[in-house]
C-alpha cells in the first residue's frame, strides 16, 4: 500500500476537525443550521490554512444524504453516504474544482459556466470551486459576473485566493467573504502532538516548537515539514535533527550575540560569526532569529512579565530573553532591531554572506549609544579628538 502524506491523511473531513479557524466554522455552521445560505463564498488566506478543505466540507454539508439516506442540509455531514465519500475521493460529479492558476482564460471559465444550466445529477446542489481565483484574466472575471450575481437556485460558487487585493471589486461585492487566519505556533504545535501520537512517533517539545515556527502559520506546511523530519530522523523527532533539517540557528548563538552587543564585546561577536560559518548556519536565519528575540525583548521592556503570555518559547529561552531585556536599554533594543531588519537586505548584495553578517553586527556595535569615553579598541571617540 502506498504511503499517504500526513497533510492528506489528516485533512479535516468535517467542521469539528478544523483547527484554528473557529470564526469561519461557527459562521458556516450557523448558516447551514438555519439554512440561510449565500450563493457565493470567497475564502481568503495564506497557503495551507484550509481554504480548499472548507470548500469540500461545505459541499458535503450541502449534499449529505445521511447514513440512512434520509438526511438533508446539515452542519455535520455524515461522511459515509455516497455524496460524502465521493466528494472526499474527488469523484462527485456535482462538485467541480477549477485551478485558476493553470486555467485562467475566458475559454476555461465559459466551459465551466456552460455546466451551470444543468441541474445536479447526484446531489441537491452543484458546487463550483475556483481556487487561486485572483489568477483569472479580466475577461474571465467579466464572463462570470452575471452568473455569479444571479446563479440558479441549485448552484453555489466557492472562490479561494491567497491574494484578495487582486480580485476585482465587482466580484468581491457579489461574495460572502471569510478570511482564514494564519495559525499561531502554539495551535500548530498542539495539533502536531495529536498527529504524532496517532502515528506513534516519538518527539520532544522543542522539536515541535521549531516545526511550528518554521510553518509560518500554515498547517499544511507544518505537516509536510513533519513528514520530512520523520524521514530525516529515522522515525523520531529530536531538537537536534529538526534544527539540522531546517538549517535553523540555535537560539544560544542569538543570545550570545545580543549579550555581546549589549556589553560592547566586538571580539565575541566576530568569534560567534566564525562559529556560525564553521557550522554552516544561515546568516539570514541568524538575523531573523535576532529580530524575533529583540522584538520580544522590546515587548517585555514595555509590558513586563505579562508580555510572555502566548509566546511559544521554551522556559529557558524565555528566561534568557528576560535577562537580556533587563540588560539592554529600550532605545538600544529598538536600534538593534531596526538595523537587523535592514541588514537582511544587505546579505544578498555581498559576495560573502558571513562577511555581510559580520558587518551588520559590527554596525550594531558602532552605532550603539555609549556613555563611555573610549571605543572597543580603546581609542578616543572622534568628538573628543576634535576637542
Language-model features: where?
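Short, intrinsically disordered, charge-balanced linker/junction segments flanking boundaries
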Residues: 76, 382-387
